[in-house]
Amino acid sequence: MAPYHRISVRVQATLSRHMNGHPAQILRRLIAVLLLVCAAVAAASAQDASPRWRALVVDTFNSRLGSPDDISTVVARASATHVNLLYVQVRRRGDAFYLDGSEPLPEGVAIEGGFDPLGDLIAKARAAGLEVHALLTLGPVWHLSTAPADPRHVFTRHGFQNGRAVEGAENWLTRTLQPDGNGTSMEGYRFGNDYWLDFGHPAAAAYVVDLVTRLVQRYPVDGVHLDALHYPEAPAGSASIGYNAVAVARYQARTGAPGLPGQDDGRWSEWRREQITALTRRLTVSALAVRPALVVSVSGVATGAAPGDPRGTVAYARTFQDWFRWAADGSVDVVVPQVYRAEHLPATADEFSAWMAWLQGAPRVRPLVIALGAYLNSLEGLLRQSRTALAASGDNGGLALFSLAANNAPVVTNPLSSPAGRDTPQRPFEDVASALRTGRTTSGQLVDQAQAAGIFASTVPRPPTPWKDTAGYVLGTVEDGSGAPVDGAQVRLDAAGVPAGPADIVTDGSGVFATPAVTPGTYRLQVVSPAGGAYTSDCTVDVSARGVARLTLVVEASRAGVASCR
């Protein structure tokens, strides 16, 4: 069967779903889908030897990193697939697979005494030509019914103690206002199995910034991957999340709104998105201030239907993660949308196609590395999705496979098998690696009858990051005359009397602001306080390529209209 014929079977369903609406909208959607089909066919018919992002996710719930032999196994397996980088989960739930003084080693995981998993992995991966990007799962911090054994654990200090929620400002957890029993428990603090930090709490936000910065200072990783940098999905399709007492008090002080905001209140929703965007930029710029060549990437929520408008997505409207903006304004180096769908199920296969069509045309100035749920798919489905994702990600994009350990699934009556409808078993890793390289299992069986070649037939480097040579950043703090942080101040960069920076830079609960990537040059800063007072900095700041300019601005009534620089 020719590749275009096989692809067209699924495209028919995608087209039929988009054929309702205004004729101009129909035409645009039709063109997007057809372009994706053409790109996928072209990618399927020739081996792409150009630089691409090829990543494997090493999830440490399923991959062992407790000994030198474990590390050697991970590196050998990754090398066998012809990927060029690893997203290695070194923080799962408030723990550390590296030697860190603030967070404990993971519980219930065998790690040899004194052994440094991350340090050993960096050395061995680099020798094998693989980059190591430290994946830190930031939001969820605990998942068991029993308390952490180590008293240093952030959940013990700032979550629950002796079965009761920590009271007052020392409680950093987010919560829902919905009653328990609908996917939540423990007074609305537990979502499924997990407890999450509330990044509307200034101390929680500062904690993860310190965590990431400290790791970058101590380990020569090639990148940091910010995972679960959003609010958790509240149950039953709601937006009832973010109701940490300190966060709500900040919102009330900022807006003057009395009482608890409603879950669908527009200002409350925008405030929650603002917290995640501000933290994302602060994490990015703080890490790049330590090592400018570092690649900072972020996981993008891609559950639910593909966007007609990103504002209708689960990411934007329910987890308050506007990764669409970050890809378009340079808030991070790489966005990794997690499009985890099963290819053998018609409903999820259609969702996958719709997401790929949208991602191919999505506005962006940074690469998209599309993450696929290998654990959900047969090997046939994984290869099909990989080709489509590579086409959708564009010339400077790529894909990430989740995960190294959970790399394929058995499927009963698999419509993608040859002949169709056979039960396909879970293949051993050796078959997965062989199929990625050659299109065949170790026994020589062709996996995808429509395409004989492997998708990773040869090794390639990951793409360069040229924007790093043409962009810089500003990291600053706004204080009042007493030295207290100013929460919610708007900051603009003004070049030669013309506002030059984005209009959405806002100080967080610590008074800190960080810009997305800006053009090198000399800037004066404009500050608008939450009360509406307008101030212009009495100094200029020089932003250089690959540089992070730092300053503190002081706004006070005694100097009307002037923000003093320190």
Where do the protein language model's features map onto the residues?
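Catalytic domains of carbohydrate-active enzymes, especially glycoside hydrolases
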Residues: D70-D95, Y219, V332-V334
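Short, ordered, surface-exposed loop/turn motifs in non-cytosolic proteins
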Residues: V474, D480-A500, P520
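Substrate-binding cleft of secreted/luminal carbohydrate-active enzymes
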Residues: W323-F324, S331-T348, W358-P464
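Structured interaction patches on ligand/partner-binding surfaces of diverse proteins
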Residues: P530-S558
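Active-site-adjacent "subsite" loops/lids of carbohydrate-active enzymes
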Residues: P51-R54, S63-R64, A134, G139-R214, ...
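Glycoside hydrolase catalytic-domain groove-lining segments
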Residues: R250-P310, A315-S378
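Short, acidic Ser/Thr/Gly-rich low-complexity loop/linker segments typical of extracellular
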Residues: A495-A517
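A short, solvent-exposed beta-strand micro-motif common in secreted/extracellular proteins
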Residues: G521-G532
